[in-house]
Swiss-Prot record:
Keywords: Cardiotoxin, Cytolysis, Disulfide bond, Hemolysis, Hypotensive agent, Secreted, Toxin. Expressed by the venom gland. One of its GO terms (biological process) is regulation of blood pressure. Disulfide bonds join C3-C22, C15-C39, C43-C54, C55-C60. GO terms for cellular component: extracellular region. This is Cytotoxin 2.
Length: 61
């Protein structure tokens, strides 16, 4: 699995074994900019300020 790992979406890396999800964290308020991307083994929970999106395909975040 390859996930974007920087705020700019064209940089990606191959996830280590066991981390089979990509995630993207974005601010819930305008501007809804991505603040963190990467690989994870479990989808982090969204919070009051941050929305989390997880997916299982290459570069989907």
């Amino acid at each position: 699995l390859k996930c974007h790992n920087k705020v700019v979406p064209f940089l990606s890396k191959t996830c280590p074994e066991g981390k089979n999800l990509c995630y993207k964290m974005t601010l819930k308020k305008v501007p809804k900019i991505p603040i963190k991307r990467g690989c994870t083994d479990a989808c982090p929970k969204s919070s009051l300020l941050v929305n989390v999106m997880c997916c299982k395909t290459d570069k989907c975040n």
